[in-house]
Regions:
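Structural marker of alpha-solenoid helical repeat scaffolds
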Residues: 74, 108, 142, 176-177, ...
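Register position in tetratricopeptide repeats
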Residues: 57-58, 91-92, 118, 125-126, ...
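Alpha-helical segment of the N-proximal tetratricopeptide repeat
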Residues: 43-77, 87-91, 121, 155
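Helix-start (N-cap) detector for alpha-helical repeat units in TPR-like alpha-solenoids
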Residues: 45-46, 79-80, 113-114, 147-148, ...
Length: 282
């Protein structure tokens, strides 16, 4: 399963930063219909925004910042250039600059949910959960089903142990992005925290399906089986972990404990300490 790192969610951010390139491509396609016409995009004098997008896609964030800075100089009231430069700054881990640019983008386009999401991610990476939550809330007022805003707000709700709210947010995420293994896993954790083991196991199974080679998926489901009192299925999952990672000491230890207790007594195994999901939104 892929992990979405707080503050450096560049895979997500590129989906945002690439948005202008789609617009530029459409402009060029229309210009090509007129032979000899000037194909320059009037919304991007000098082509700096388009160049910045390409640099950002290639993770050349310093060059992307330079291009977006020139785009801002040419079009200082175009919010997308501030948004894109903020994304590039995040790629360089220059969060103060990223925050300032997201704020400027919001000032210029207060109904663009993406800038609130980006600024919220910066705040979240700086451990300002309440301020980040306010930005995600605002983004969702504008775009109620934005999966990124829902994903990160769900992470905050998990951190605050507001399990049902987290479930509600991650439900939207998995509906919009069913291949998001991290969202399935986090909703499973929230269900498990409410002692809803059947639902948790079903979600862990969905998470495993997105990446069957990840041993941690089976490990998490094994723990849910243990908490549900099904040591046999827990053992099967731990064996699956060891099939992928034979030297996994944790899985070896847990499996041995299960087998020892099963041989010693027919009573259900006492659950081991709860394992929390990874420390960043996924």
């Amino acid at each position: 399963m892929k992990t979405y790192k707080i503050g450096t969610v560049i895979s997500l951010a590129i989906a945002f930063v690439a948005f202008p390139s789609g617009f530029l491509y459409a402009q060029k396609k229309r210009a090509q219909k007129t032979p000899g016409a000037n194909q320059a995009n009037p919304k991007d004098p000098g082509g700096h925004s388009a160049k910045g997008v390409e640099f950002a896609k290639n993770k050349e964030y310093d060059k992307a910042v330079e291009e977006f800075t020139q785009a801002i100089a040419a079009e200082p009231n175009d919010s997308k250039n501030y948004f894109n430069r903020a994304t590039a700054y995040r790629g360089l881990n220059q969060l103060t600059e990223a925050f300032a640019d997201y704020s400027k983008a919001i000032e210029l386009a207060p109904q663009d949910a993406r800038a609130y999401v980006g600024r919220g991610e910066v705040l979240l990476s700086q451990k300002q959960q309440d301020n980040a939550l306010a930005d995600f809330d605002k983004a969702l007022q504008i775009s109620p089903n934005d999966p990124n805003a829902r994903r990160f707000r769900g992470f905050i709700y998990i951190s605050k142990t507001e399990w049902q709210k987290a479930i509600d947010d991650y439900t939207v995420v998995v509906q919009k992005v069913p291949a998001d293994g991290g969202a399935w896993e986090r909703r499973a954790f929230a269900y498990r925290s409410l002692n809803k083991y059947k639902e948790a196991i079903a979600d862990y199974t969905k998470a495993i399906a997105t990446d069957p080679t990840d041993p941690d998926g089976y490990r998490r489901r094994a723990q849910a089986h243990v908490m549900a009192g099904d040591s046999q299925k827990a053992a099967e999952d731990l064996k699956a972990v060891l099939k992928i990672k034979p030297d996994d000491v944790d899985a070896q230890s847990r499996l041995k404990a299960l087998e020892t207790r099963a041989n010693a007594s027919p009573s259900p195994v006492t659950s081991s300490p709860a394992t929390s999901p990874a420390g960043s939104p996924r």
